[in-house]
């Protein structure tokens, strides 16, 4: 999520800090128009580190869902990993296959949804995202520039 649909200003969990990247609204609408499912898979180490909690994360996503629904944009699913091996909060301090580069979040989505994997792709801003996509046999693209233009380019190749 952070660095892909919104600017990553570091541990984004407050509405005031959530700023869409250029072309995101148009790009998400385009994906929906082309009948793509849209999923968010996100590491949320700030939960493990005690910077914010799961309710803060869920509150931000409810705000996001409510605002995007006014534009007829919906995420089909959101998967997140609250874990980090160096977390301050004991229940979240562990290695987990949910945390990217692990691909358990992707596996969970594949189990829950009927998806054409050949036409599926992942956009991320970190090497851990790329490695997760590779483990999941998904086309990967690093997040860059205008999101809408990036989506159009990916769909041309895909």
Task: Say what each PLM segment does.
Residues 5-6, 46-49, 85-87, 129-130:
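Short, active-site-adjacent cap segments at secondary-structure transitions
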Residues 55-58, 62-76, 88-122, 126-158:
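Asp-based, Mg2+/Mn2+-dependent phosphohydrolase catalytic module
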Residues 1-37:
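Active-site neighborhood of HAD-like aspartate-dependent phosphohydrolases
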Residues 24, 28-64, 74-84:
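Substrate-recognition element of Asp-dependent hydrolases with the DxDx(T/V) motif
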Residues 7, 40-42, 142:
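Hydrophobic residues in well-ordered beta-strands that form the structural core
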Residues 16-17, 50-55, 93:
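Short, solvent-exposed loop/turn segments at secondary-structure boundaries
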Residues 1, 42, 124-125:
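Active-site flanking residues adjacent to catalytic metal/cofactor-binding acidic residues
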């Amino acid at each position: 999520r952070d660095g892909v649909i919104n600017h990553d200003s570091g541990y984004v969990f407050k509405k005031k800090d959530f700023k869409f990247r250029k072309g995101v609204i148009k790009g998400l609408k385009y994906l929906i128009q082309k009948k793509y499912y849209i999923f968010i898979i996100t590491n949320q180490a700030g939960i493990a580190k005690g910077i914010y909690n799961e309710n803060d994360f869920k509150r931000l996503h409810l705000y996001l869902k409510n605002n995007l629904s006014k534009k007829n944009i919906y995420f089909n699913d959101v998967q997140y990993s609250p874990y980090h091996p160096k977390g301050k909060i004991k229940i979240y301090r562990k290695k987990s296959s949910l945390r990217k580069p692990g691909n358990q979040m992707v596996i969970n989505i594949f189990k829950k949804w009927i998806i054409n994997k050949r036409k599926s792709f992942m956009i991320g801003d970190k090497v851990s995202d790329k490695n997760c996509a590779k483990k999941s046999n998904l086309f990967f693209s690093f997040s860059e520039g205008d999101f809408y233009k990036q989506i159009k380019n990916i769909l041309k190749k895909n």
